[in-house]
From Swiss-Prot:
PROSITE patterns: GLUCAGON. GO terms for molecular function: glucagon receptor binding; hormone activity. Promotes hydrolysis of glycogen and lipids, and raises the blood sugar level. The keyword Metal-binding does not apply. The keyword Cell wall biogenesis/degradation does not apply. This is Glucagon-2. It is found in: Secreted.
Length: 178
């Protein structure tokens, strides 16, 4: 308890002394306030200069990085040329790939055109070499012959059905009419 009372007394003493000293310092503070304001304005201008200098530094640093990257690239190019090892460029690989794709497409087109027009040429070439040969199913002769036979059978059955149904239908109608 005694410690708290002594602490409160010391604080009261400090406050009273500061209150008595403040009227004396007011006269001195007016002149110091003017200098403090001018110092604050000067300090406010400093961060702008720092920002500008930071921007200048960043600009110079990025230019330095670009120059360094260009220099490193040139050194790499010169070293790769000096090594004498055959190097495959990306453009060469792309060209080779494009040519391969084109040739594959062209081969596919040639094969399809050969399939479309090939049997007649192949048949005449085979006949001249080996004599007459029977046509294969791939050539389409068997399929077309079977289709012709089936069409003629279907036509005969249809005609037979029509003839039988008309005669029975006519006779029924005639019987109903009479």
């Amino acid at each position: 308890m005694f410690g708290i009372h002594s602490l409160a007394g010391v604080l009261l003493l400090v406050i009273v002394q500061s209150q008595l000293a403040s009227p004396l310092q007011e006269a001195e503070d007016n002149s110091s306030l003017e200098t403090a304001d001018s110092l604050l304005e000067d300090l406010r201008g400093v961060p702008n200069m720092k920002r500008q200098s930071e921007g200048t530094f960043s600009n110079y640093y990025s230019k330095y990085q670009e120059e360094r990257m260009a220099r490193d690239f040139l050194h790499w190019l010169m070293n790769s040329k000096r090594s004498g090892a055959p190097s495959k460029r990306h453009a060469d690989g792309t060209y080779t790939s494009d040519v391969s794709t084109y040739l594959q497409d062209q081969a596919a087109k040639d094969f399809v055109s050969w399939l479309k027009s090939g049997p007649a040429r192949r048949e005449s070439a085979e006949e001249s070499m080996n004599g007459p040969m029977s046509r294969r199913h791939v050539d389409g002769s068997f399929t077309s012959d079977v289709n012709k036979v089936l069409d003629s059978l279907a036509a005969k059955e249809y005609l037979l059905w029509v003839m039988t149904s008309k005669t029975s239908g006519k006779s029924n109608k005639r019987q109903e009419d009479h």
